Amino acid sequence: MITGIKGFNDILPGEVERWQHIEATARRVFGLYGYAEIRVPILEKTELFCRSIGDTTDIVEKEMYSFVDKGENAVTMRPEGTASVMRAYIEHKLYAQDPVAKLYYMGPMFRYERPQKGRYRQFHQIGAEVTGVTDPKVDAQVLTMLCHFFAELGLTEPTLQINSLGCPECRPVYREALKSFLRERLDRLCDDCKRRYETNPLRALDCKSAHCKEATADAPAMLDHLCAGCDDHFAATRRHLERAGTPYSINNRMVRGLDYYTRTTFELVTGLLGAQSAVAAGGRYDGLIADLDGPAVPGIGFAMGVERVALLLGQQEFARRPDLFIAALGTEAQDEAFRLMCGLQRLGVSVEMDYEGKSLKSQMRRSDKFNSRFTLIIGSDEMASGRATLKAMDTGTQSDVLLDPTAIAGQVK
């Protein structure tokens, strides 16, 4: 038997409906805030992610699915969505159409990681991006929209944590302060953090190693090294969050795993998923578009893991109930049931029937399995009279109905 690849999961009926609910909620909520959907390719030039995410990140160093294609091009299956969306934004000159672009995306991403609960090698993200505005009100609105989405799903447990990573003016000062702190603790860091000490010391704050977490527990905070502009921006973002009624807490150790973030960074975290506590995360990336050879346009965005959101929804039932199940006894009744089913489906009624000529008892068990809203039984008497009894399964109420698609649709829709 050929099985699926480790970390690449099938999403089966019963679970798909949960995903569709998440996606539909995102489309509805994001639409309220003026976002339009964009769809970008799964495969991109490897250079895109090296330049955007950062050469010294875990994603680029260890996790990307990269290969050289038959045309000798170095390509990568996208590990995240922001870089691809910004590449499309630049390539198609969306900045010339409107100074402010609001975009969202959905789709699979790929990283070679150790599969575990809520983390897979093919995983799915829903993300949103805003370009063209540095005003901290936009930061607050993006965060408010994200929290609004989770509230619409009925999920109040994930909590918002925010931080500021400063800008190219103040981050070098913090970088030196952090290097000075780490210099006395290098022997306690993991090999990766030792190697990155010179090139990217901030990665030590994001390291998953227990030794590194312990060694950096009292590390200096970026918030204590912000320049006046970044300090004002972070303070204004917090004020606007409070005006919007969006609760938050400050996590001054948050650095995220992507090098392009500046100023506001954030996560929605939960204690319900074990070690995989972040269900959504993002931040501001005011230099990314210029770094990718686009104009000097600021941006901010986020992505959420659909698998993790689905886990938070638990065992809620999202499978759609058929409107009607038709139980038919005998060949002529089955033919009539098929005619009615086709006519009803054209009228927008969801219908199921038995195709195997089973007993009435067996067909009623199948109706129960489908959890249909109504059941219609057709036998020889019903064929002779042209009428049948329609039963509402939730209430037990019965009504007499003509064996006609329009008449039945009027009763069940």
From Swiss-Prot:
Keyword Aminoacyl-tRNA synthetase: yes
Gene Ontology terms, MF aspect: ATP binding; histidine-tRNA ligase activity
Protein name per the record: Histidine--tRNA ligase
PANTHER family in alphabetical order: HISTIDINE--TRNA LIGASE, MITOCHONDRIAL-RELATED (PTHR43707:SF1), HISTIDYL-TRNA SYNTHETASE (PTHR43707)
Quaternary structure note: Homodimer.
Gene this chain is encoded by: hisS
Gene Ontology biological process terms in this record: histidyl-tRNA aminoacylation
Database matches in Gene3D superfamilies: Anticodon-binding domain, Bira Bifunctional Protein, Domain 2
Superkingdom field: Bacteria
EC number, UniProt record: 6.1.1.21
Top EC group: ligase
Recorded GO CC terms: cytoplasm
Family recorded in the similarity comment: Belongs to the class-II aminoacyl-tRNA synthetase family.
Alphabetic keyword roster: Aminoacyl-tRNA synthetase, ATP-binding, Cytoplasm, Ligase, Nucleotide-binding, Protein biosynthesis
Subcellular localization(s) per the UniProt record: Cytoplasm
Catalytic activity: tRNA(His) + L-histidine + ATP = L-histidyl-tRNA(His) + AMP + diphosphate + H(+)
